[in-house]
Every structure is written in structure tokens, then in C-alpha cells.
Amino acid sequence: SLSGEIPTDKMTYRTNPSTGDKVSILGYGCMRLPTIEKEGEEGGDEIDQEMVNRQVDYALAHGLNYFDTSPAYCKGRSERAMGIALSRHPRKSYFIATKLSNFAPATWSREASLAMYRNSMKELQVDYIDYMLLHGVGMGDGMKEFNARYMDNGLLDFLLEERKAGRIRNLGFSYHGDIKVFDYLLSRHDEYQWDFVQIQLNYLDWRHAKEINERNTNAEYLYDELAKRKIPAVIMEPLLGGRLSKVHDHVVARLKQREPERSVASWAFRFAGTFPDVLTVLSGMTYMEHLEDNLHTYCPLQPLTDEEMTFLFDTADLMMQYPTVPCNDCKLSLIHI
């Protein structure tokens, strides 16, 4: 990655049109926080709170202000760890995003889902949530599961009321899977007024998502549907589960020839950040070096030129000719992101 100090005052920000929030283009994904092994316990690792605190402090000091967690992350321990780290800072200095991650049928009842929502506030040590998401709509069996999780139990109505009361400042959803659910929720935008939507977007998924996994939808369609309605997009999987930082040698050579000083990953982060209706790009930064490299990329962001965009789309086409791309065994599919 680029050598030299990372400036603390050069972060690129995007403005959320519904609240005026100035959100850093780099968002901190809290799904894989650093851990330490606990001695003598089977599979017993615990979150390295000291390291989480250090990385959060470093991120905030360099202008990053958006943190994305969920009750489902880190075996259910991510929210607590983020609450501990962030509550050491003024509440107005960060935006916290969490989700109603009621995937298990046991959590579909109104009581269980409300308990999950209230527990998030408690773990995060906050009395309002900046960005609240319906988590992974389109997963499982599509509309049927969506209705069971959010409609039949009155949960969506409840969350809309919470937004009115100010306990939720922005309400949105993250989408994976059945496109019917995505299209349905956007068709109700006049009624629900989504403040943001979280989608998987990267230069491979832009036009090849369906080829990689037929359950997915090309990012070009998802982004365009949001941009048409001026709904800010939050980006997940900018590296496609790490695959865009671990590419074939010939792709590495191709990227390095263009930008010898920049990391392979930085191309993917610049790609995601170049789109004007993107509010923030989430990166799961387990290690300080991930954080530093991404801060280099986004302090400030140098958007891709049209010519560089074409170069990346050609790179994606090239990558699709190599059938070894598909799975990096990141286990994401097993934990309902």
C-alpha cells in the first residue's frame, strides 16, 4: 500500500439527503472483530476488546464515523464490543448501524423481535439508532419469509413508528437473494420512505453476480433502481468476501502495472466509492493494516475515471474466464449476513 502518514482531515464524506448526516465514505463492518484465544476452552476465542477500542479510536481520529453491526455478528458479541468501544466517545461523533436479525423462526414472534431490538440498544449503550436495517431481506424463501419476519408480526409498522419517535433516525434494509422482495420494497417506497438500502456491489458483481451465484442479482440493476429513486446505497461486499484482494497473479500484474503503489484491494474500494449515490462502503476490518490501507484509499477518495472503469469491467470479464473464482470459503453464507 502507499507509504507515508495517513492524513486525519482528508476523509471523503457523502451527505445523507434525508438527515443531512455527513457520512464517511468508508464504513466499519463489525462482523469479524479481532479475537484472542482463551486458554483451555474448546473453540473458546473472545473478542479482543483492547484491539477493538484501539481500531475504533484510530478510525474516528481519521474521520471514519459509520459503524455497521448486528445481533448476529461475532457469535452475538459484536454489538456489546462496539458499545464498549464507541461509548467512550461523544454520541454525536459516530453513526451506528444495526439490524433486526430475526433469521431463526423462534425469533419471528413480535415479542422475540422486539426483545432483539431493545437488546441492541442496551448492548450498544444508546437511546437511538442512527441506521436500522431489516436484515437480509430476500433470504430463505423470499416473500414468504419476509412476511413472517416483518409484516405478519407488525414489526415493520413498529419500526416506522420508532422512526417517527426519533429512536430510529434512518430506516432501511439489506438485500440478499430473491429479487422479488427487493422490487416489492422499492415499489412501496412512497409509503415507507426508505432512508437507505444496503446492497452487495463490486466490479465483479456489477454484471456477473448471477453467473457467480444464481440467487444473486447484478449490482448494476440494484444500484440503478436505488439511484432512480434517490435512495442512498450502503455497500457491502466491496471485495466480494475478500476475493477481490486475492486475485490470480495475472490480474495482480494487470492492476499493478497501472498503479504500482496501490494495493489490489484499493481498486475495488475506489470502484464502490465512485458512484455518487453511495453513502458509505463497508469493509470488515479485522486487522489494523486493513484499516490503514482503506484509509489511504478514502482520505481522500480519487474516483475512477471512465477509462479506469472500463479497465475494471474488462478485468472482471477476464476473471470470469477463470472458473476458480467462485468461493473463497469465507463462511459468510453460513451465518446470514
PLM feature spans:
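A short, structured active-site edge motif that brings together acidic residues
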Residues: 92-105, 134, 199-201
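Conserved, mostly hydrophobic/aromatic
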Residues: 16, 28, 67, 82, ...
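CE4/NodB-like, metal-dependent polysaccharide N-deacetylase domain
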Residues: 112-133, 161-165
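Short, acidic/polar
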Residues: 45-59, 109-123, 179-186, 264-269
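Beta/alpha (TIM)-barrel catalytic core signal, keyed to glycine-rich beta->alpha loops juxtaposed to Asp/Glu
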Residues: 137-332
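Conserved small/polar residues in nucleotide/adenosyl-binding loops
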Residues: 335-337
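N-terminal binding-site loop/beta-alpha segment at the start of enzyme catalytic domains
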Residues: 1-94, 127, 158, 164
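Active-site mouth loops of central-metabolism enzymes
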Residues: 32-49, 100-111, 254-259
